[in-house]
């Protein structure tokens, strides 16, 4: 039925259950309360086969209700059968709760009907309820006028494309949330590949904690592994180098930190020589210094002690530094035979300035020692923000930082995690937009992530979640309510998501596009049954592993 005819002819007429329903009508409004409607569904005798409306109206379905001057749309939030035993005729009443989404407003002359979020005219009691048609879906979820990218299809009609508004997604923060196995890695890959296909000169840095994204961007990614990573120790802030070198016990840590601070400042001044700015150096100034000079200064300070008993913190520092310099796992930080100021080269490689055909950097931190992985993440996030902070606004390079397993670095419990890492990510979340830095958080434990940070995300893709705490967190922090969709979170299939926020035209349930096998992240679980079919590994297999283990090389 034509939308105009529905609006003019039916909105003012209450439809009683004993009257003939308008063709296509599935029910009528029985309650209006804020952004919620109750609708009595048509279906005849609940003990008979006449259940067409019952079968068509499903949780998450999009319906429409004509009003006096608009057509309101909403998602089915819940379904119930009231008085199922019914009367002697065996009839009951099926009721649908509907969460309103927006409305189709009358078109201006020569213009098609325009959909807008929010409701200006509410449906009246008795107003007819219809299922949204394919044309309705096309109007509501049509390709936006601003630059947008296809990332999948609509749940209600797989032939309709789901779009991502690239500017709104990139200029603000985002999150991909879902339990393990829901398809987060593939969803992220679909989004990033769509962005890079449209913007081949982009700048994306992806922190890869499991080593799974390297194969997803062949030919267009700078893939950095622990064997090829270069983050020299002199780029660390004092908090970060203290975390690496000093003891965990608070009193000992404080003593060692004071010793280390004096040694580092002196070593930096030694490296700068007579440079005019050396007098303004601080312990956090990112200039090179030689670790042997730090060791020398610590040794000299220890030699001036009056009591040998006070030498313990000095000895601990010297022992730790020596151990780390010998440990091949830390070679990316403490290796290198020649000390030089190559900060610009390091930033160029990580941030893709210039792009040189590789607009994304995949930093595989899966083999970074667990003792310092938080320090590495803190350093990377900090240098990304600081570079943007000190750039000229007119020439600044916008950058997207993707942080997988975000709950590791910004836990909700402030007593856990590494405070500088939390602070670095928090600065990006709270201030990054002003400087052209946005962040995409990916996690399977949204309830364990800092709520103040995740609440900064303006676009959210919520995938399957079965944990009630996670679901409640999503409901509290999403930029807009879509309860009719969010109630489906526990039942979403793999690759499906509830997409809400400013990066999508309207709240929607989508299925992400299928990835070609060669672009799929390598995050699949080990196939135990297949591996256990044969007994092919022996002592030689163990010997090879032990060799790599001992000499810390792959």
Question: Where do the protein language model's features map onto the residues?
Answer:
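P-loop NTPase motor domains
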Residues: 211-222, 233-238, 243-424
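Hydrophobic residues in beta-strands of the RecA-like P-loop NTPase core, especially within AAA+ ATPase
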Residues: 207, 403, 442-443
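Loop/turn-to-beta-strand initiation segments
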Residues: 201-204, 357-360, 396-400, 435-440
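Basic- and hydrophobic-enriched, low-structure N-terminal and domain-boundary segments
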Residues: 1-177, 394-397, 413
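Conserved P-loop NTPase motor module
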Residues: 494-554
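Conserved ATP-driven motor cores of ASCE-family P-loop NTPases powering translocation/secretion/packaging/pilus
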Residues: 247, 426-431, 435-513
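Conserved beta-strand position immediately N-terminal to the Walker
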Residues: 174, 363, 440
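Glycine-rich phosphate-binding loop of nucleotide-binding enzymes
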Residues: 146-231, 451, 499, 529-532, ...
């Amino acid at each position: 039925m034509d939308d105009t005819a529905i609006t003019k002819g039916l909105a003012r007429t209450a439809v009683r259950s004993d009257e003939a329903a308008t063709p296509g009508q599935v029910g009528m409004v029985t309650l209006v309360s804020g952004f919620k409607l109750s609708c009595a569904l048509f279906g005849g005798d609940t003990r008979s086969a006449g259940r067409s409306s019952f079968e068509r109206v499903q949780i998450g379905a999009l319906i429409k209700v004509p009003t006096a001057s608009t057509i309101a749309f909403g998602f089915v939030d819940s379904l119930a059968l009231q008085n199922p035993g019914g009367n002697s005729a065996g009839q009951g009443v099926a009721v649908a709760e509907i969460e309103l989404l927006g409305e189709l407003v009358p078109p201006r002359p020569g213009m098609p009907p325009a959909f807008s979020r929010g409701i200006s005219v509410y449906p009246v009691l008795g107003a007819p309820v219809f299922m949204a048609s394919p044309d309705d879906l096309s109007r509501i979820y049509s390709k936006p006028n601003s630059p947008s990218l296809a990332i999948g299809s609509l749940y209600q009609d797989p032939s309709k494309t789901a779009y991502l508004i690239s500017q709104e997604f990139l200029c603000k923060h985002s999150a991909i949330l879902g339990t393990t196995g829901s398809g987060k890695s593939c969803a992220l890959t679909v989004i990033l590949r769509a962005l890079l296909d449209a913007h081949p000169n982009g700048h994306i840095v992806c922190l890869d904690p499991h080593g799974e994204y390297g194969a997803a961007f062949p030919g267009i990614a700078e893939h950095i592994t622990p064997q090829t990573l270069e983050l020299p120790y002199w780029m660390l802030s004092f908090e970060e180098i203290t975390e690496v070198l000093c003891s965990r016990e608070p009193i000992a840590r404080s003593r060692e930190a004071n010793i280390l601070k004096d040694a580092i400042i002196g070593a930096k001044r030694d490296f700068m020589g007579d440079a005019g700015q050396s007098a303004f150096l601080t312990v956090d100034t990112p200039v090179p210094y030689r670790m042997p000079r730090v060791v020398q200064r610590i040794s000299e300070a220890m030699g001036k002690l009056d009591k040998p008993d006070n030498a313990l913190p000095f000895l601990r520092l010297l022992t730790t530094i020596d151990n780390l310099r010998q440990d091949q796992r830390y070679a990316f930080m403490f290796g290198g035979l020649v000390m030089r100021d190559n900060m610009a080269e390091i930033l160029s490689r990580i941030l893709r300035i210039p792009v040189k055909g590789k607009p994304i950097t995949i930093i595989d931190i899966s083999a970074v020692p667990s003792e310092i992985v938080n320090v590495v993440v803190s350093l990377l996030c900090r240098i990304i923000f600081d570079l943007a902070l000190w750039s000229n606004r007119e020439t600044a390079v916008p950058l997207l930082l993707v942080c997988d397993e975000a709950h590791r670095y910004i836990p909700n419990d402030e007593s856990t995690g590494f405070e500088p890492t939390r602070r670095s990510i928090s600065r990006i979340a709270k201030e990054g937009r002003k400087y052209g830095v946005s962040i995409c958080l990916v996690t399977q434990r949204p309830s364990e992530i800092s709520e103040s940070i995740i609440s900064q995300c303006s676009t959210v893709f919520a995938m399957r979640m079965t944990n009630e705490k996670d679901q409640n967190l999503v409901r509290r922090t999403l930029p807009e309510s879509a309860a009719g969709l969010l109630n489906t979170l526990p039942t979403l299939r793999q690759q499906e998501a509830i997409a809400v926020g400013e990066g999508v035209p309207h709240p929607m349930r989508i299925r992400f596009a299928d990835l070609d096998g060669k672009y799929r992240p390598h995050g699949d679980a080990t196939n135990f049954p297949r591996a256990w079919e044969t007994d092919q590994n022996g002592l030689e297999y163990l010997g090879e592993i032990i060799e790599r283990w001992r000499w810390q090389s792959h």
